[in-house]
Amino acid sequence: MSKEDVIEVEGVIKEALPNATFQVELENGHVVLAHLSGKLRMHFIRILPGDKVTVELSPYDLTRGRITWRKK
């Protein structure tokens, strides 16, 4: 899967789960499980419930995603 295949959507963190996994409510109302991308882990970016984030979804599984950006 290449970078052109991913779907980028905005969302809000609903709940923090173990192992850097989060429940994210997307703009369209769907709730997905998302994990932190490598760069966010590497730079110790803190993500808390209520933060606005950008999530990349795979077209093959729309229930899981990767958090790639935290809005300021």
UniProtKB/Swiss-Prot annotation:
The keyword DNA damage does not apply. One of its GO terms (cellular component) is cytosol. GO terms for molecular function: ribosome binding; rRNA binding; translation initiation factor activity. Keywords: Cytoplasm, Initiation factor, Protein biosynthesis, RNA-binding, rRNA-binding. Its main location: cytoplasm. It is found in: Cytoplasm. Residues 1-72 form the S1-like domain. Pfam families: eIF-1a. InterPro entries: NA-bd_OB-fold, RNA-binding_domain_S1_IF1, S1_domain, TIF_IF1. Belongs to the IF-1 family. One of the essential components for the initiation of protein synthesis. Stabilizes the binding of IF-2 and IF-3 on the 30S subunit to which N-formylmethionyl-tRNA(fMet) subsequently binds. Helps modulate mRNA selection, yielding the 30S pre-initiation complex (PIC). Upon addition of the 50S ribosomal subunit IF-1, IF-2 and IF-3 are released leaving the mature 70S translation initiation complex. PANTHER family: TRANSLATION INITIATION FACTOR IF-1, CHLOROPLASTIC. Component of the 30S ribosomal translation pre-initiation complex which assembles on the 30S ribosome in the order IF-2 and IF-3, IF-1 and N-formylmethionyl-tRNA(fMet); mRNA recruitment can occur at any time during PIC assembly. This is Translation initiation factor IF-1. It comes from Alkaliphilus metalliredigens (strain QYMF).
